[in-house]
């Protein structure tokens, strides 16, 4: 999902939703092309595996750091380059969760956890022998795992497009809660609509603030001029 110029609004700040499918290769290819349009921001909304036993199915994860085991951008953006969280996006996403769920701030932490998101290119990571990715994810203090978020954030950093990640826990494979067909259908009915409304609300908040606030200095090097 991203903000980009749109023929549907006079102020050219429409919202475009893009289904990127599954996997970091898709995420890279699509964000490579979207970046050419110079969107004001893009958000990753998707499902993830919850890595903490205290998480419940349907909880949200606001990504503030990334473990990059997706491997698709290792040459363009080496792993030693940190991918920082952008305060403007983080605040908008947290406010959007509060607005849509109508939960008081004291209860928000019950359904929204901020933490590290690990992204892998191996769909069967939990079947690998220990120690493997499970140990690395534990060492990184990751709270969620998916296949695309780190790629989208890294490409946002690479192309100077403000980025953010809000995931929804759909299964907990390390704790015996896997996504079975019946459970998945119920989960999708209950959560997908709310998740999308949160993403749209976050973009509306960013739009109300204006694009100038989104042009984060975190995305520019010390020897680089500002550009859109």
Predicted regions, residues:
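Metabolite-binding pocket within alpha/beta catalytic cores that recognizes anionic/polar moieties
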Residues: 4-92
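Short glycine/serine/threonine-rich phosphate/pyrophosphate-binding segments
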Residues: 25-28, 147-152
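Short acidic/polar active-site loop segments enriched in Thr and Asp
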Residues: 40-41, 143, 162
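Active-site rim beta-loop-alpha module in soluble metabolic enzymes
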Residues: 80-139
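Generic non-transmembrane alpha-helical segments
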Residues: 92-104, 155, 198-206
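Zn-dependent metallopeptidase/amidohydrolase metal-coordination segment
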Residues: 150-187
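His/Asp/Glu-rich mid-to-C-terminal helical/loop segments that flank catalytic regions of hydrolases
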Residues: 173-227
């Amino acid at each position: 999902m991203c903000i980009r110029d749109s023929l549907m609004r006079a102020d050219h700040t429409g919202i475009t939703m893009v289904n990127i499918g599954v996997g970091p290769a898709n995420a890279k290819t699509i964000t490579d092309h979207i970046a050419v349009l110079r969107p004001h921001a893009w958000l990753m909304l998707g499902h993830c595996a919850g890595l903490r036993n205290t998480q419940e199915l349907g909880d949200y994860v606001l990504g503030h750091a990334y473990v990059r085991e997706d491997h698709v951008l290792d040459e363009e953006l080496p792993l030693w380059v940190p991918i920082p969280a952008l305060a403007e996006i983080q605040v908008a996403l947290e406010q959007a969760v509060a607005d849509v769920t109508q939960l008081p701030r004291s209860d928000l932490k019950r359904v929204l956890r901020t933490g590290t998101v690990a992204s892998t290119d191996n769909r069967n990571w939990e079947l690998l022998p220990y120690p493997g990715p499970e140990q690395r994810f534990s060492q990184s203090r990751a709270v969620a795992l998916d296949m695309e978020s780190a790629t989208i954030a890294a490409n946002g950093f690479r192309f100077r497009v403000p980025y953010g990640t809000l995931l929804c826990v759909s299964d907990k494979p390390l704790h015996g809660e896997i996504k079975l067909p019946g459970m998945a259908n119920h989960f999708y009915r209950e959560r997908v609509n709310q998740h999308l409304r949160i993403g749209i609300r976050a973009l509306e908040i960013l739009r109300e603030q204006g694009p100038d606030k989104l042009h984060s200095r975190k995305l520019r090097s010390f020897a680089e001029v500002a550009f859109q």
